[in-house]
Regions:
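Conserved pre-ATP/AMP-binding loop-to-beta segment of ANL
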Residues: 6, 149-167, 174, 197-203
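Conserved AMP-binding/adenylate-forming
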Residues: 31, 46-94
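Conserved AMP-binding A3 loop
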Residues: 34-36, 163-187
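AMP-binding/adenylate-forming catalytic core of the ANL superfamily
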Residues: 91, 362, 367-368, 375-378, ...
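Conserved AMP-binding/adenylation subdomain of ANL enzymes
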Residues: 186-203, 211-252, 266
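Gly/Ser/Thr-rich phosphate-binding loop
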Residues: 225, 247-255, 264-325, 338
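Conserved beta-loop-beta connector loops within the AMP-binding
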Residues: 306, 338-359, 395-396, 458-462, ...
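Conserved ATP/PPi-binding loop(s) of AMP-dependent carboxylate-activating enzymes
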Residues: 316, 332-336, 348-379, 416
Length: 516
């Protein structure tokens, strides 16, 4: 590792083990791990991976909640040149199987809590990966030899070597694994450090799941770079978070607007001592003004912004001083990030105030999707990442996200592809046609509503279709409403006219909000 390139992340724990060996790196539900201990575990596991035949570019997938065991594995992978593929435990077995098939890991590590889920997913695979468990009682005590003829190239880890493979929703409902390199992660964390600074004195509360890019690159990795402490939580629970802030003296955290809404609505919010919480990051969507004011009234500074997995994810930043006067904006580009506004059809780039598709380039932009050259070529054109998001840039250079050109909507921070839900609905014998759209929701930002054209002579209702979906997709993807219609508006090319559906929905919804 000593000869690895300068921007490789395996160096980070080694450096901290020398600089602040006894500082707590991870507080995992009360079990604490110092930087010395974290680096020792990561180094030992990296060496064991190499001995077992794992090398540059090999992939290890995990199904686990946030844990110090996965943190140790992450840095072991960074030191060994192995790619970590953290998979979502919220997926259905069929969805999880598709992610495993798409990523082809050499090893799957499963936390005991998710054994049944992993079993069901692997049963759907023709040739599933070898399996083990995380932690000192599993992978750290024995690494199964990799199933491969010959050995991987033995060389130092380079900046451009892949480090993370994070799945993001595909526009056609197919899983897409975004490849993030060491350099991608280095540069996005460097940019974050210049806009939402952390020091070794900070205590970061991490509630974002580690199968999301934000679970790594929005605060936790920066914290481990500078020697701060990260308090890991398995899932978000408003009551527990309000206990942890004063108990652990949390100084900063990251969440989606729904997280901050649940906290503000909790009966203990007003009485909770938030004096240590100097700062919080908001991602996933813009924070509504009333909620923004609620947190400002409690003395918490809020940094908002915009990002996407393919950009590691940080693209636009709205610091607290701007957020107080520029409500609803996404901000300006992070340092080391270049953006442009272009015509979505012609690709012509506009100068000055303009509306168009947001393009991104810079060292934090990914290199492509794993083994999906066509999808990669579509996303990366002429050196620019085409986000598929429609933005408005004002004369002062501030950006506002006004619509998504692609159909994915975001609910509670989760990206959801309507086509995936539609394809499952089409499998129901009573469904003749279907369309799913995201509609505004005060609690979740957006929720899904399904429009159904029923087949004549086949009985069904909303409860029946919801039960059908619940067996086949993750719970967070379930539409919050199902409406039966005579027809689905479509273009001459048979494309669903989602904006027409949304306009019709909003014109007939009394509150313009689907219930939570």
């Amino acid at each position: 590792m000593s000869s690895d390139s300068l921007h490789t992340l395996g160096r980070w724990t080694s450096d901290r083990a020398v600089a602040t060996p006894d500082r707590i790196a991870v507080d995992d539900r009360g079990v604490q791990l110092s930087y010395r201990a974290l680096d020792a575990r990561a180094t030992a596991l990296a060496e064991a991976l190499g001995t077992a035949g794992f090398g540059i570019g090999d992939r290890i997938a995990t199904i686990t909640g946030n844990s110090s065991d996965q943190v140790a594995l992450f840095f072991a992978c960074a030191k060994a040149g192995v790619v970590l593929v953290p998979l979502s435990w919220r997926l259905s077995p069929a969805e999880l199987a598709s992610h495993l098939a798409a990523s082809r890991p050499a090893l799957l590590l499963v936390e005991d809590e998710f054994t049944s889920l992993a079993d069901a997913a692997c049963e759907l695979l023709v040739d599933g990966p070898p399996r083990s468990t995380l932690g000192v009682g599993g992978i750290e005590s024995h690494v199964p030899p990799i199933r491969r003829e010959g050995m991987r190239e033995s060389r130092p880890v380079r900046d451009d070597d892949p480090l993370l493979l994070i799945f993001t929703a595909g526009t056609l409902g197919t899983p897409k694994g975004a490849i993030l390199s060491h350099a991608n992660c280095f540069w996005t964390n460097l940019a974050l450090s210049r806009t939402a600074e952390l020091t070794s004195a900070d205590v970061v509360l991490a509630v974002m799941p580690q199968y999301h890019v934000g679970g790594w690159n929005i605060q936790p990795l920066l914290a481990w770079w500078v020697g701060a402490t990260v308090v890991l939580e398995r899932t978000f629970d408003a009551g527990r978070v309000l206990q942890l802030i004063p108990d652990r003296k949390i100084t900063t955290m990251m969440g989606v607007p729904a997280n901050y809404l649940f906290l503000a609505e909790h009966p203990d919010f007003a009485a909770t001592d938030l004096s240590t919480l100097r700062h919080a990051i908001v991602g996933g969507a813009s924070m509504p003004e009333p909620l923004l004011r609620t947190w400002h009234a409690r003395g918490v500074a809020l940094t908002q912004g915009y990002g996407l997995t393919e950009a590691s994810p940080n693209v636009l930043c709205l610091p607290d001083e701007d957020a107080r006067t520029k409500v609803g904006l996404a901000g300006k580009p992070y340092p080391h990030v270049e953006v442009a506004v272009a015509d979505p059809v012609t690709g012509e780039q506009f100068s000055g105030a303009a509306t168009g598709e947001l393009l991104v380039r810079g060292p934090s932009v990914f290199s492509g999707y794993f083994e999906q050259p066509e999808e990669s070529a579509s996303a990366l054109r002429s050196g620019w990442l085409h986000t598929g998001d429609l933005v408005e840039r004002d004369s002062d250079g501030y950006y506002r996200v006004i619509d998504r050109i692609k159909d994915i909507y975001i609910s509670g921070g989760e990206s959801i592809a309507p086509a995936e839900i539609e394809s499952v609905l089409f499998g129901h014998p009573a469904v003749a046609d279907a369309a799913v759209i995201g509609v505004p929701n005060a609690r979740w930002g957006e929720v899904g509503v399904a429009f159904i054209v029923a087949r004549r002579g086949v009985a069904t209702d909303a409860e029946d279709l919801t039960a059908w979906l619940r067996e086949r997709i993750a719970r967070f993807k379930l539409p919050h409403g199902i409406r039966f219609v005579d027809s689905i508006p479509r273009s001459a090319a048979d494309k669903i006219l989602r904006r027409s559906l949304l306009a019709d929905y909003l014109s007939h919804a009394p509150s313009n909000r689907e219930p939570a």
